[in-house]
């Protein structure tokens, strides 16, 4: 049975992932058996009404829908935020659309035959988390002690941490000390990303900043989602578009037709360095569509050709040789007057690859880390202890 929830946070407090972690511990204490890691599902990055973390969570437990619903509802009525809870065995296929489009909450609610409670707007995210499959990446979140909330985070690691990241990559990825600790007021202390939970737990043991009281391992779509290609696009959508042609550098940004790669992504220098060259590119653009802007979130399968014609040098004095007309190969040295048939020099450069914004600037969803399923076949996370660690002496009830 799936227990899914969304929007249990507030602008300056609370966190849906923390609420879900505590709910999982609560349900286990009531005798319900946990069946897998909690799921953390990042949602549409284009909508302006998203929550701070822009994610919903789903838990999988063994038990009757009615009993799980009543127990979870009673627990969540005391939680921060005004979110939604959904409990059922089957969820409507709304996951891709909830990540890429704007959905009508009333229409989504009609498709769900299970039990639910809360706001319809939050129900969309909860149902998306409940329906999500194929989540082979993980995020390990650790939470601050309540008495430290509102104070600056103390985020530091043992020197061995960076050595572990280098050795374990890509089983641990995008978790450098500079980006693991968020800057906002939420209770998350740090987040380690990867695809191998045992190595990620080991990395957490090398954290020597402020103490944390709880840590949870989530399955997630983070760093692995590729939006679908569509001919049409509408405001507040996350979509992939194909572009062929020449890009243009305008100010600090780079334009691919109507789509803008903003300087803040940290990757515009790839194209700015080629100013003075003519260019032809073929690329798939992941685009966040908003009113007045279509921002590029990633460049996939980029193929770029750059070329520049250079005037040949005079073989006698080394001066520049200029053309004597369009219908002739004759050139004349501007310095000494020497004439000869000389072909212009053509400098060509080629770039191929997939490019994402730098760490700390990319969307949660963006990345190319698609790993084999974990745990290995025949093993699942059947108790909170394999996914949730609670510091000694803290009563979670």
UniProtKB/Swiss-Prot annotation:
It is an enzyme of class 6 (ligase). Its EC number is 6.3.4.22. It holds the Pfam family TiaS_TCKD. Its main location: cytoplasm. It catalyses: cytidine(34) in tRNA(Ile2) + agmatine + ATP + H2O = 2-agmatinylcytidine(34) in tRNA(Ile2) + AMP + 2 phosphate + 2 H(+). GO terms for biological process: tRNA wobble cytosine modification. It comes from the Archaea. It is found in: Cytoplasm. GO terms for molecular function: ATP binding; ligase activity, forming carbon-nitrogen bonds. One of its GO terms (cellular component) is cytoplasm. Keywords: ATP-binding, Cytoplasm, Ligase, Nucleotide-binding, tRNA processing. PANTHER family: DUF1743 DOMAIN-CONTAINING PROTEIN, TRNA(ILE2) 2-AGMATINYLCYTIDINE SYNTHETASE TIAS. Belongs to the TiaS family. ATP-dependent agmatine transferase that catalyzes the formation of 2-agmatinylcytidine (agm2C) at the wobble position (C34) of tRNA(Ile2), converting the codon specificity from AUG to AUA. This is tRNA(Ile2) 2-agmatinylcytidine synthetase TiaS. It comes from Ignicoccus hospitalis (strain KIN4/I / DSM 18386 / JCM 14125). The lineage of its organism: Archaea, Thermoproteota, Thermoprotei, Desulfurococcales, Desulfurococcaceae.
